[in-house]
């Protein structure tokens, strides 16, 4: 057999050596000599410290100090990883691990005991602690309350807007500090300087789907390609059951189902 054919040959049980006993034909997890140290291979279990198997196949209890290289960052003991830790988390047990919610060492954010506090949320590259809350005063700033250390979805200060210098402005009410989906001021439009303009009524401050003047034909430059009238788009056309002629707007839009101009296939009345 050539070297190329040998490389391409699929791996079978006959070509597999057990790392526990060194014999071919089975894996370590199926080894009939599981209690033996086998041929003393270099594989060492970091749970019990014995050679011949890996931690996921370990038949023994975890032992402190078994594998010096592996250290649990929850309790600080060697011999297991955090996901297998049988002990309670000890603050500061693992130096270098820092929770981004409270800023303390020794646990990750998912294990944070202060998860209900106002310090939740992300942080920027420049990290600094902001007082008793333990939150980071990095680049992230909440656009609801203006405080640093959390983002809007984690804001503990409700829906109220703020008068900070942020560039977020709601196009529904014109107030800074929140976006339209979080607006506490209802559907009312505003006469701000925003560039958002409803093409139904021609007023700024809202989009067509939120327009309080649904019956208005407006002065927008958008035209429905179904009926040719301005003020709405095809999916909102009140004349959906009408005939579709090429002279009723729609330009070069042609349905590939019926061949008529003025609509596309998903809106075809002849389907």
UniProtKB/Swiss-Prot annotation:
Q: Matching SMART domains, A to Z? A: ZnF_C2HC (SM00343)
Keyword annotations of the record: DNA-binding, Metal-binding, Nucleus, Repeat, Zinc, Zinc-finger
**What domain of life does the UniProt record list for this protein's source?**
Eukaryota
Q: How is this protein annotated for GO cellular component?
A: nucleus
Coiled-coil region(s) at which residues?
none
What are the recorded GO MF terms, alphabetically? Answer: DNA binding; zinc ion binding
Query: What SUPFAM superfamilies would the database entry show?
Result: Retrovirus zinc finger-like domains
Region Disordered, as annotated, extends over 1-42, 107-136
Q: Which InterPro entries match?
A: CCHC-ZF_NABP (IPR051714), Znf_CCHC (IPR001878), Znf_CCHC_sf (IPR036875)
User: Where are the compositionally biased (Gly residues) regions?
Assistant: 118-136
What Pfam families is this protein classified in?
zf-CCHC
Role played: Binds to single-stranded DNA located in the 5' hexanucleotide repeat region of the L.major leishmanolysin (GP63) gene.
PANTHER family listed in its UniProt record: ZINC FINGER CCHC DOMAIN CONTAINING PROTEIN (PTHR23002)
| Record-given protein name | DNA-binding protein HEXBP
């Amino acid at each position: 057999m050539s070297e190329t054919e040998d490389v391409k040959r699929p791996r079978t049980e006959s070509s597999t050596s057990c790392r526990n006993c060194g014999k071919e034909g089975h894996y370590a997890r199926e080894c009939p000599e599981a209690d033996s140290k086998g041929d003393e291979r270099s594989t060492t279990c970091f749970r019990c410290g014995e050679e011949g198997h890996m931690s996921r196949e370990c038949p023994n209890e975890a032992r402190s100090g078994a594998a010096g290289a592996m250290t649990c960052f929850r309790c600080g003991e060697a011999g297991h990883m955090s996901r297998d830790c049988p002990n309670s988390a000890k603050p500061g047990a693992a130096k270098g691990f820092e929770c981004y919610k409270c800023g303390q060492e020794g646990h990750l954010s998912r294990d944070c005991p202060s998860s209900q506090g106002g310090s939740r949320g992300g942080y920027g590259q420049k990290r600094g602690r902001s007082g008793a809350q333990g939150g980071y005063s990095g680049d992230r700033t909440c656009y609801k309350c203006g405080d640093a250390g959390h983002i809007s979805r984690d804001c503990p200060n409700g829906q109220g807007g703020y008068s900070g210098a942020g560039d977020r402005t709601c196009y529904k009410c014109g107030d800074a500090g929140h976006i339209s989906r979080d607006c506490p001021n209802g559907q009312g439009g505003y006469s701000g300087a925003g560039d958002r303009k409803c093409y139904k009524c021609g007023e700024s401050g809202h989009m067509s789907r939120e327009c309080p003047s649904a019956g208005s034909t407006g002065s927008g430059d958008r035209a429905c390609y179904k009926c040719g009238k301005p003020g709405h788009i095809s999916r909102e056309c009140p004349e959906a059951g009408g005939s579709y002629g090429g002279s009723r707007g729609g330009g070069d839009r042609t349905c590939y189902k019926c061949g008529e101009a003025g609509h596309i296939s998903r809106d075809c009345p002849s389907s």
